[in-house]
Amino acid sequence: RREADHIVVAAGAWSHYLARTLGDHIPLETERGYNTTLPIGAFDLKRQLSFEEHGFIVSPLTTGIRVGGAVELGGLKLPPNYSRADAMLRKAKMFLPKLKIANGRQWMGFRPSLPDSVPVIGPATQSSRVTYAFGHGHLGLTQSAGTAKLVAQHVMGETPEVDLFPYRAQRF
């Protein structure tokens, strides 16, 4: 058993299970995104390329090239459908004929998403000692620093820079 003055629930796609134990029923669904990281030398790319109409992005990394995108509502229990990653690789090769698509490492990640596309940030309904911070969908990494700042302000008893009312769990 552990004790704490305050708990922050930021468990991604599993957060709604924890919230339910506190009486908050949050309709979180899991978007699944796919990517393939190709090894160094797969393509000489200096900046990210976005193929929005085709549903994928090609990004340079220190570890190679990443081809990623796709959205699939598949929950937490279904096995990955890597044919989605394969399809993005084929499309990328079509646009970048010199792209070497062999020896890639495929990955699937969970994106905790809500029906209104607005994350849950703020106190639990039944306990002011629990703060929620989840449901950012495919913008989780992008919005994480801003959410962390708001949560820290809230937990420390400060007035957050942004009104947390629109982000409350009770809106569902």
Regions found by a protein language model. Give the residues of each.
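C-terminal lid/capping helical subdomain adjacent to the catalytic/cofactor pocket in oxidative enzymes
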Residues: 124-172
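Active-site substrate-recognition segment that forms the wall
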Residues: 2-128
